[in-house]
Amino acid sequence: MDARQMKIKAAEAALEHVENGMRLGIGTGSTAEEFVRVLAEKVASGFQISGVPTSERTARLCLELGVPLKSLDELPELDLTIDGADEVDGKLRLIKGGGGALLREKIVASASARMIVIADETKVVDVLGAFKLPIEVNPFGQLATRLAIEKVASRLGLTGDIVVRASGDGPFMTDGGHLILDASFGRIPDADALAVELNAIPGVVEHGLFIEMASMAIIAGPEGARTLKAS
C-alpha cells in the first residue's frame, strides 16, 4: 500500500463519522483532499452536508467535485471538522500548516464540536518538531517578529533556522495575506509552553501547534486504519 492509498484509507474511515445533515469543516492538504474526493462520491448519491472549507484551495476542489459549501459566517457552529496533520503525537497534539492554511484551519476547528485528524502512519511521532513548525506572521515588522520568536525559542532551549517560506520568486502568501515563517527546531519537548509563548508575540498571527483540539486521529498504515485517542 503506497502513501496515497493509506491517505485514502484514512479518509474512508473518517467518512464513517460524518452523519447526514452535518455542518462539516473541511481541511486542507493532500490527505484532506482525499477526504473531499470520498465525500463527494457520497454527496453524489444523495448524502447531505454543509461544508465549510479551510482554504481557497479546498473550496475550489469542493466546488469542482460538487460538495456544497457555506462560509463560516453562515455556519459559525460546526458539528465536526476533518483535517490532516503534518505531525501528531500520543496526546493528539499536532503540527499543522504545511499547506499554508493554519489560521483558517484553527479557526474552523475551534468552531467545531469535534475534530478528527486523518493521517498516514509516517505522521505519528513521539515528540513534535521534526516537521518544520509553520508560524504565520504579519508582513509588517516581520524581522522584528522573527527576532522575538528566536528569543522565545532560546528561552525554551530550542535552536534551528527560522526562514520565510518561499513560493516561486517571492514569499509564500497565505489566503489572509500573511507570511509564514518555518521554524526547524527538530524537537519541541514542551509544545504547550511554546504555544503559549508564541501566542504572546504581537506580530504572530497564528502558529501550527494545535493543542487540545483533536478529539481523535485516524491513522492509516499498510494493515489498514486504526484510531488513536489521547494518552
From Swiss-Prot:
Q: Which GO terms describe its molecular function?
A: ribose-5-phosphate isomerase activity
Q: What class of enzyme is it?
A: isomerase
Per UniProt, substrate binds at T28, G29, S30, T31, D83, G84, A85, D86, K96, G97, G98, G99, K123
Catalysed conversion reaction: aldehydo-D-ribose 5-phosphate = D-ribulose 5-phosphate
Classification via Pfam families: Rib_5-P_isom_A (PF06026)
**Alphabetical GO biological process terms:** pentose-phosphate shunt, non-oxidative branch
Question: Which E.C. number(s) belong to this protein?
Answer: 5.3.1.6
Record's family? Belongs to the ribose 5-phosphate isomerase family.
What name goes with this protein? Answer: Ribose-5-phosphate isomerase A
Which source organism? Answer: Sinorhizobium medicae (strain WSM419) (Ensifer medicae)
